[in-house]
């Protein structure tokens, strides 16, 4: 499940094996893309780099010891680090 949440101006997805929701704000995508993206741009970038986003979410869950149902967000730094590892 990946959706654009216009109420919070963020992309939301369910990390594997986690009951909470992970969000990535449009401003994080702005840093990643180097321009202010549309929601469609954000979804396209997520789709093209889904493995890295999911890896970043898993790393944050582990690093922070998040509860199984905790909601959380990824920053552009979280995603950039995961993209570097995924390549």
Label each region the model flagged.
Residues 1-18:
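Short, charged/polar N-terminal "headpieces" of proteins
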Residues 11, 22, 72:
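A broad, low-specificity signal marking well-ordered, structured residues that form hydrophobic/aromatic
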Residues 16-33:
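Short N-terminal mixed-charge amphipathic segments
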Residues 39-87:
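Acidic, low-complexity intrinsically disordered segments
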């Amino acid at each position: 499940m990946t959706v654009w949440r216009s109420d919070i101006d963020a992309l939301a997805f369910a990390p594997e094996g986690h009951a909470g929701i992970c969000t990535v704000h449009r401003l994080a995508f702005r840093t990643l893309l180097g321009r202010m993206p549309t929601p469609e741009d954000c979804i396209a970038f997520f789709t093209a780099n889904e493995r890295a986003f999911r890896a970043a979410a898993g790393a944050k869950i582990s690093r922070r010891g998040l509860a199984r149902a905790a909601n959380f967000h990824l920053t552009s730094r979280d995603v950039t680090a995961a993209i570097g590892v995924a390549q």
